Amino acid sequence: DGCFESHATQPRATLIDRCTGGFMRFRQGGDYNQMPNHLADLTLWNFNAKNNVADSPFIWWDNNSLWWKFLPPIVVGYHGGSIHFDESQMKLNEEQGNTVTPYSLYEAQLRKRLGAVPAWLNSLQ
């Protein structure tokens, strides 16, 4: 199963919006001199996990590893599989186990900015 990848020095602000897939540790990359894997603006919104990490609790910043470093993320509507997050390492963990509305944060932001979701985007659904 695939999962999101976050390679060191590159990710600064990422919205993973209503995606379905795996959620596994150590699928990230980057030289240890270029950590963290992600800076402060990682948001997972309505993530439907099909393959969860067995680690409990799931940590975002591993002091015992050179290669697993995420600044505290925002996670809203994580569902599909059972996982226990270390909430002390998160900005926000809301509605875990449930889908939330708006279903797509990206589309809701477009609606607010543009007044509507563009037709080309609606045609992809």
How would you label these PLM feature ranges?
Residues 1-125:
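Extracellular parallel beta-helix/beta-solenoid repeat domains
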